[in-house]
Amino acid sequence: MFRKIITYLTIYSFMFSNVCWAAMITPDGRTQTTVNVNGHVYDVTTSTVSGKNAFNSFSNFDVYKGTTVNLYLPGSTLNLINLVRDGKTNIDGILNSIKNGKIGGNVFILNPHGIAIGKSGVVNVGSLMLSTPNKEFMDQVIGQDGSISELATKSVLAGDLPINPAGVISVKGKIKALDSVAVRAGGVVNAGEILANLKPTQASDIVNTGGLDIDAPLAFKDGKIGVFAENDVVNAGTIKADA
């Protein structure tokens, strides 16, 4: 009997653990997003594309400590726009953006509830924009029926979006971008490392040259770092764009 109880507890623990890990990333059905899991590695792909822009829409998006999440840019896309709707995003593991089999691409993560990169969190990208837009704008970008707004997408790419003043972006870990980093939120707290321009950049690699054409005044230009907040910006860490 005692042995049976132990067996039941082991099975329950295994099943409960799997449910918890599965809840880490939850697509909401507005985009054709697929999450493939191999151990503690999560590969996230999408076939929702408009011009040079690919889209993921999630109910929840977290990266647990000890896990690696790879966000893939499909085909010839340059920009990957990720919308998270139902809860704060916590990144405590490794988050990579993959373009043509290596780190690259322009990655946007939009979450009205805030984004936190913990001490063990590392983000490796081509370029990155983190923002906390309001919920109304999120619904404009991709509607409940999956329709994509060209006008709202242009605003995302330009970094010109209405911000939720209660949304906070905090960095205690590391952001490592080959090109640029832009942060727009209600409040920003950096106690980690935000590193950009980690290799020489070529304009043709980072400017959207098809689909929705913009000049990218804020994000993804010249290996710079831009941090903007409706309220306070607190920097107790490192913000550095290598020459």
Language-model features: where?
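Bacterial N-terminal signal peptides
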Residues: 8-17
